[in-house]
Amino acid sequence: MGKLRKNLLAWAGTGVAAACAVTMTAVPALSTPEPEAAGVVSASPYLYNGWGNPPSPTEVMNASGIKNFTLAFILADGTCNPAWDGNRPLDGQDKATIDAIRGAGGDVIPSIGGYSGSKLGEVCQDSQSLAGAYQKVIDAYGLKAIDVDIEATEFENDASQTRVLEALKIVKEANPGLRTVVTFPTLVNGPNDVGKRMIDKAARIGSDVDVWTQMPFNFGGGDMAADTITSTEGLVAHLKSAFGYDDATAYAHAGISSMNGKSDTGETVDQAAFQKMADYAGEKGLGRLSFWSVNRDRPCDGAPDACGGIDQQPWDFTKIVAGLQS
């Protein structure tokens, strides 16, 4: 969810945002057209085993009520082969995390890609081999859903965009019921030209992505709740244009992945702003609400991989996402 994930930036400023009370208003659950698979997609914040001091997922589940997590990040191991962070095997530490989450009644959606590292969409030379790499991840964990976080050159390059979309089409056809998420950067008014090109391409080739999730931050400031809603409305408008969706269907194919606390550029998403995003997501029936990251969703000790840089209680943002579970 931005450069803080692997290229930690110098902390901008030393002040901590003022305390912000969270009012947990009741809102409708997010859109769940296929309940078993959709649950892991619709409300699942990011958890990253390869960053800082990751929290125990079962402790977070018990304290917050969250059921599902998006696990970051699967990269290429130097070849067209998937590995956590490009170096941890699929059957290692991260599988133990998945087993623990499932043992506690939850589930996971792995995130493939991210801002940094060697991306499968660039290393794999064609859509068939890329689909094969995705399939290895699906088979390793018996997945109901996958997230492709497409950023940087993988996002900007037309050929790698095409490989990703074609590979997602292949794995959806090979795995009935599998849900696919594409997460990508955006502007205040919605997708940039590269994002629009990607969505238009998916419509042309028949790549049936279930949820297009924007990362509405690193805008440089402003009202983060209002800007997020504006950006999402821009996404919804383009989905309607590209696919011919009606309003309800377009909202169900749109998602938000915010960044709790301080963003890479020093913006602040506090609890009240994130609650407004959650209210909007529930009211509109969005297909997904997430944030970067559970690792940062706790009181701050000054390290950007361990906290969000604002005054908060443990798991404030995770609890907000949990409020949207079906």
UniProtKB/Swiss-Prot annotation:
Originating species: Saccharopolyspora erythraea (strain ATCC 11635 / DSM 40517 / JCM 4748 / NBRC 13426 / NCIMB 8594 / NRRL 2338)
Protein name, entry field: Chitinase
An example Gene Ontology biological process: chitin catabolic process
Signal sequence segment: 1-35
Gene, per the UniProt record: chiA2
Residue positions of the active site: 151
Keyword annotations of the record: Carbohydrate metabolism, Chitin degradation, Disulfide bond, Glycosidase, Hydrolase, Polysaccharide degradation, Signal
PANTHER family per UniProt: BIFUNCTIONAL CHITINASE/LYSOZYME-RELATED, GH18 DOMAIN-CONTAINING PROTEIN-RELATED
EC number: 3.2.1.14
Domain GH18: 40-326
Gene3D superfamilies in the cross-refs: Glycosidases
Family to which this protein belongs: Belongs to the glycosyl hydrolase 18 family. Chitinase class II subfamily.
Example of a GO MF term: endochitinase activity
Catalytic activity: Random endo-hydrolysis of N-acetyl-beta-D-glucosaminide (1->4)-beta-linkages in chitin and chitodextrins
Domain of life of the source: Bacteria
Disulfide bonds: 80-124, 300-307
